[in-house]
Amino acid sequence: AARRGGRKKIAGLCCAVDKKRFHAVLGGPFGQGNKDCLEYVLSVAEQLGFRTVNLDGYCGYAEIGEGKELVGIVGHLDVVPEGDGWKYPPYSGALEEGAIWGRGTIDDKGPAIISLYAIKALMDDGFKFNKRVRVIFGCNEETGSLCMKHYLEVEEPISYGVSPDSEFPVIFAEKTINSVEIKGESTDGKGAKLVSLDGGIVINAVPDICTLTVNANGENPADVAQKICDALSKNNIEHEYAVHGDEIRFTVHGKAAHGSVPQLGVNAISYAVAALDGVVNNDFVRIYNAYISTCVHGEKLGCFAEDEYGKIAVNVGLCHYENGKFSIKINSRLPFSTDTKTMFNGIKSTLKNEVCAKVVLLSESEGFKIDPDSDMIQVLYNAYREVTGDVESKPVCTPGGTYAREFNNCVAFGPEMKGYGEMIIHQPNERLTLEAMKAIFEIYVKAYADLIDKVSFDSKK
């Protein structure tokens, strides 16, 4: 029954989250959409035979089994904004072309509900739960993980567990993540003037659209527009513009990607500002192009670093300019060879002579590393290999961040995997193929059984 029912429930979950998710409501601190989604998932879990608890709308869980140790499977129901360019409506859960389409089908509603049904499959098979198993559903992973902070304030921590919110075969390390803002007040020089600029929806995604308005300020508007168009076209950047008197309004298009891998996207903000070089003479444009530009590894910003797991990832996720005031918000993923203090000081040192700019640390989430030869990593790794036959893929260090960093003895495990086409997250047309869903389900059934049976930790936090 569990194996037959999962597809419809994943589609239902995609429909349950709507655009109201950011507005807090009674019983739902993260918005009506997240509140509805959490209540829906818990009602499904209760019907499946789980004990369920709603923790004040911050998160909830479905539990089965008895015992001292508590095994956690920690997923999230919140999603990043849907953006434009979808083939099918992003909250329809449309079953088309052999896939379920919708925001969150892969990140992370789909894997969360697949995990619930994997445990249900073990229940139906008569598996002996000699430990408590708790499938936890958070509602604020994408914008701060306040849900898990609340969980840890009111509930016991898990003894060990996984977060189905990354990739296979298994994640043994997550890099430190931080967010920095460069803000200030810009002075204009002669020539065309930047009136406003807006780009990005969330800080942890590569922005695929940026809008800006330029005033010709005595120059020929058509000439100003042509210069900007030429610069954008030179970099193969799609754009549209309209001239309204002395003002030229541009919409610049990039390619969305997860903020942890900015090299896979095309940052609409960075290319929009680059196109203003030589057209608009002000501090904001000069500073952006001199120290950030289209670089994604902090080469010009004074924070470049790398180690055996790769280079630092530096993503401008949000940018706003109006009335001379500017804000550039940057999300970064750090190699283990550096830390937030070193990075922050490097940026401050680089910008020390820019008196109009101030650097502010907005947030930090420290990474972690677990021995890839540890029992837990090897149990998960071997379960993946046994089900898939993939003996080439190795445990991974990821620039992404998951709930795993909120707990001790917790790692990310799936769902992204080789052999099932492109698994798109944080972009239009996110979808989970039925073939991939079946494979993920079978991996989780095997891995969760082994995780419960073959791994043990002291339950102290």
Identify the residue ranges that each predicted region occupies.
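Acidic/His- and Gly-rich active-site-bordering loop/insert found
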Residues: 1-103, 127-129
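Zn-dependent metallopeptidase/amidohydrolase metal-coordination segment
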Residues: 2, 322, 375-454
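Buried hydrophobic packing segments
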Residues: 41, 112-122, 151, 272-276, ...
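A short beta-alpha structural unit
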Residues: 59, 292-296, 315-320, 329-336, ...
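Active-site metal-coordination/substrate-binding segment of hydrolases
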Residues: 70-137, 143, 155, 427-439
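Midchain, well-structured core segments that form catalytic/ion-binding scaffolds
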Residues: 142, 148-335
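Redox- and metal-dependent alpha/beta enzyme cores, enriched for Fe-S-associated oxidoreductases
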Residues: 340-356
